[in-house]
Amino acid sequence: MESQRNILLIGLLFVSFLLWQQWQTDNAPQVAAPQTQVKSHVSAETSSDVPEADGSVSTAVVASTNLINVTTDQLVIKINPLGGDIVYAALVKHKTEIDKNDPFILLEQSSDFNYIAQSGLIGRDGIDSSTKGRAQFTTTSSDFSLADDQDKLTVPLTLVTDTGVRYTKVFTFTRGQFDVGVDYQVNNTSDKSLQLQMYGQIKQTIKPTEGSMMMPTYRGAAFSTSDVRYEKYDFEDMADMNLSKSTLGGWAAMLQHYFVSAWIPPATDANTIFSSVSAGGFANIGFRGAVYDVAPGSEQSISAQFYVGPKDQKALSAISETLNLVVDYGFLWWLAIPIYKLLMIFQSLVTNWGIAIILITLTVRGLLYPLTKAQYTSMAKMRNLQPKLADMKERFGDDRQKMGQAMMELYKKEKVNPMGGCLPILLQMPIFIALYWVLLESYELRHAPFMLWINDLSVQDPYYVLPLLMGVSMWLMQKMQPIAPTMDPMQVKMMQWMPVIFTVFFLWFPAGLVLYWLVGNLVAITQQKIIYAGLEKKGLK
């Protein structure tokens, strides 16, 4: 019964952790989103979207021009020639729903929601400004596609000013990748030097975070600088104070469950990461790059990278050494990362995420077996001492000091550690929470099937079979546990109801996590039988 209480304690602590986390979300002040009138289904940004050199940003929405369509093996992109902003991005190989073929739309502009990536040239001679307006580019075609025999696709947008300066904004797409190169090629054929500064920002309508108690998710901004490797900056933070951080390199991003968009300026440039909340209910986060002086008769390239896709840790790490931190495992990241890597190894061997979860459960339980055995042995010794402890209670009555001293002497004589059953709990709890965050944050498990009716391990079991089996396994474990004679009858009654209570809680857990708990219970039952058989041979029950 002590072991059952320990397991239930782990679960209760975990559920309490989730309840506290959800309370934090539910009681956080909400950022008010002012309403705005939108006149067209697809819209573009006016000159008021452009950040000034001092970092101020404002937004407005007006009618759009025709868009440039780009299709690769991973992305469907739409670019507005007014400014060259990315106003639509769909992920070809990631579906909106598991039973539909519609690609997942990450960036979009509609009458009620805007989520776009803007970039331009500002500074003294910038072609994008809040007073003169956005650059109006032209292009040779309105449709670009990555051919089967191509590894790269370039989409050039061109602008020639009245003074003869030629600006070419080139978008570069690479097969199999979600990052987009954005490069300004400036050919200064005028007789004056130019002072230019690139900016990139992500603009999103402030939208409440969606999620449940068992699957809390974050929707908001994040950034990285030379001083801060990774920090979330949610809509409430952005409303309270505009961000302005000087840094070498760095990045600015918008996050949501499983997906991210991010601007990554050159790592060796002096940049400023900034944010704002503007009229119309828009949140903006981005960077202002280094200032370039382009002499008459010279050429200059000014570039940055933009990522729009899943939270693929390998792909993100290849772009920036800290960008993979958007896969946020919380305070137990140091434990979650090796669990994730081990899970990836198992999945590569068996090519089934459900079986990989089973294998990692067996591994964790196997590593903890020596501690589990020590726990059961300690509890068995404690049960055998109950008659002697009862005698002490009668002998010493209310004299707690003498009672405590006698108990310590008895424990020392019998070589029993009364806290011996606690260590496995202290180890299992962080492992369980870390694995929970791995299953919650790892995009690889989105729409990942297991077998039979489980076609998505990242959501709850649609027929609640796994939670019911988990409840049965907890009941079996309970039946296997000896009941201490000194246990209060009311406490025994409460313990008997725990499998039912936990079954109800687990109805809304992701199927992958319930699978982990179920398999863990089955392994624990097997380990109990083995350990108890060994203890009986030693005269311990």
UniProtKB/Swiss-Prot annotation:
Broad class of where this protein is predominantly found: membrane
CDD domains: 5TM_YidC_Alb3, EcYidC-like_peri
Transmembrane segments: 6-26, 342-362, 420-440, 457-477, 500-520
One CC-aspect GO term: plasma membrane
Alphabetical keyword list: Cell inner membrane, Cell membrane, Chaperone, Membrane, Protein transport, Transmembrane, Transmembrane helix, Transport
Superkingdom field: Bacteria
GO MF entries: membrane insertase activity
Membrane found in the keyword field: yes
Biological processes annotated in GO: protein insertion into membrane; protein transport
Location of the protein in the cell: Cell inner membrane
A Pfam family hit: 60KD_IMP
Membrane topology reported for the UniProt record: Multi-pass membrane protein
Function according to Swiss-Prot or TrEMBL: Required for the insertion and/or proper folding and/or complex formation of integral membrane proteins into the membrane. Involved in integration of membrane proteins that insert both dependently and independently of the Sec translocase complex, as well as at least some lipoproteins. Aids folding of multispanning membrane proteins.
Family: Belongs to the OXA1/ALB3/YidC family. Type 1 subfamily.
Quaternary structure annotation from Swiss-Prot or TrEMBL: Interacts with the Sec translocase complex via SecD. Specifically interacts with transmembrane segments of nascent integral membrane proteins during membrane integration.
NCBIfam families: PRK01318.1-1 (NF002351), PRK01318.1-3 (NF002352), yidC_nterm (TIGR03593), yidC_oxa1_cterm (TIGR03592)
Protein's recorded name: Membrane protein insertase YidC
